[in-house]
Amino acid sequence: MASPLKILISNDDGVFAEGIKALAHEAARRGHSVTVVCPDQERSATGHGLTLQSPIRAEQADGLFADGIRAWACTGTPSDCVKLALGKLLEAPPDLVLSGINHGPNLGSDVIYSGTVAAAMEGTLEGLPALAVSSACFDWRQFDGAAVQAMDVAESALAGGWPEGLLLNLNVPAVPPDRIGPVRWCRPGVRRYVDQFDERFDPRGRSYYWLAGEVVNDFEAAGTGPKDWPTDVAQVQGGGVALTPLQPELFWRGALPPLPIAGVSAAPDAAAARG
């Protein structure tokens, strides 16, 4: 990059996670100014939730990172962390928001639940370039390759002109750096789960439920996006890096049936909706 960037980094795995340390250290190694604001504990699958009924506390955690990296551990959600950083903790707006490296994939429909993606999306909502990055295996603990991939993609995208409202979601296969495949634009795939709840009983015989389940990657589902792009699920399964463009807008742009309600006009066709 022509000049050092001001980078804000968050995650949903918490301040002690190895993934966020690898990402922060790689960004700092390249000469960028790095600030970490992330949850003080595991906050996975919190989506875009915010803390409204209790205070949010932030404690400095510089000692957990390399020299020169400023860090705060917050009691809130990933979205809280980015909001607090942008609204109170940072002296100036960052040039880039990064989230991750997540311990596990954020592919296809998983992004709806992901705190990692939500933290990056918070940056997008504030008009900032943002990238979420995940290592596609929960047990993998070698994050250096994913950190390099994330910074390469982010720096390249910024140099090329980052469109406003674009969130990049990067998933890196869990293999050694020299075996990581090529980066490709991907469309969101479909991931479904079976046997989602495990019923258990406490010592007093009362039942409780533990969210578990087994993921089923659906390679046949059409998904969304250009059909000549692979799905992110298929790309990572094949050993490549999946880069998926996302946006906060949720408006449906396909065809709609007429509503069976008096006084409501027929739905526009797909072409009109896209216009």
Curated annotation (Swiss-Prot):
- Which organism does this record belong to? Synechococcus sp. (strain RCC307)
Protein name as it appears in the record:
5'-nucleotidase SurE
A Pfam family annotated for this UniProt entry = SurE
Per the record, the similarity remark reads: Belongs to the SurE nucleotidase family.
HAMAP family linked:
SurE (MF_00060)
Write down the EC number: 3.1.3.5
The record's cofactor note says: Binds 1 divalent metal cation per subunit.
Instruction: List GO terms (cellular component aspect).
Output: cytoplasm
Q: Which reaction does it catalyse?
A: a ribonucleoside 5'-phosphate + H2O = a ribonucleoside + phosphate
Keywords, alphabetical = Cytoplasm, Hydrolase, Metal-binding, Nucleotide-binding
Q: Which PANTHER family match?
A: 5'-NUCLEOTIDASE SURE, 5'_3'-NUCLEOTIDASE SURE
Its localization reads: Cytoplasm
Q: Which InterPro entries match?
A: SurE, SurE-like_Pase/nucleotidase, SurE-like_sf
Task performed by this protein: Nucleotidase that shows phosphatase activity on nucleoside 5'-monophosphates.
The cofactors required by this protein are: a divalent metal cation
Residue positions annotated to bind a divalent metal cation are: D12, D13, S44, N102
Q: Which GO terms describe its molecular function?
A: 3'-nucleotidase activity; 5'-nucleotidase activity; exopolyphosphatase activity; metal ion binding; nucleotide binding
